[in-house]
């Protein structure tokens, strides 16, 4: 039998929102397997977890730079929101974006070794900023995208960079529409562009959880399969961009809005500052959606 530590119970509780005793029971039932315990709680209807309740700790900003047919989105972390709004910090972030987009390093590790025109490594540029500003600063991640003259980038920063989204519309030069799609992604936080990107393994896992949920609700076995397929459709709406109702027009699917531009979504990147590091992430969805609908 696995050793069910208090830390493991705490982690499961943070991820699911379930009660402490329910979390402990789930871990016992699944022999300490955290992912299996999450599924166990979901099957029992005890999990209130959602992707918007990720745990984060870092402050900082996201930033997007477009230059012709190239664009970069990056995240730079600091220890406090106060420093993230500091002019010197913002100048550093802008400079990093320009250097990375020019050199196109393959990784953060490679990026830190790049030198500017004065021969100073990016790692040392950051260290100098740390000494000046007085907080730890980290280049956490970045992604570079390219397009053709027939395509368009959609870039959107929410709350001055708390969330950043970069999307590419292929076959459409409607940059305004591309930005609208980026706003939608910021608000709703899809995981995939379309159902084709969802692995068969993930679909089967979700089907199993939904089946157990229906059975635990006391539904007759002869209608469970039909119910599960209906709920699976709702799952795809939650995670797939093209299946979602467009935030600026809930009567229209994103798929139809994009089709009206004559283009298609060729991928997107969405960064939320500090996601995945220990501290509860604010729920930005309602705030972003209200702002989007006002545009």
Curated annotation (Swiss-Prot):
It comes from the Bacteria. Its main location: cytoplasm. One of its GO terms (cellular component) is cytoplasm. GO terms for molecular function: translation elongation factor activity. PROSITE patterns: EF_TS_1 (PS01126), EF_TS_2 (PS01127). It is found in: Cytoplasm. Gene3D superfamilies: 1.10.286.20, DNA helicase RuvA subunit, C-terminal domain, Elongation factor Ts, dimerisation domain. Residues 80-83 are annotated as: Involved in Mg(2+) ion dislocation from EF-Tu. Keywords: Cytoplasm, Elongation factor, Protein biosynthesis. Transmembrane segments: none annotated. Pfam families: EF_TS. NCBIfam families: tsf (TIGR00116). Associates with the EF-Tu.GDP complex and induces the exchange of GDP to GTP. It remains bound to the aminoacyl-tRNA.EF-Tu.GTP complex up to the GTP hydrolysis stage on the ribosome. Belongs to the EF-Ts family. This is Elongation factor Ts. It comes from Lysinibacillus sphaericus (strain C3-41).
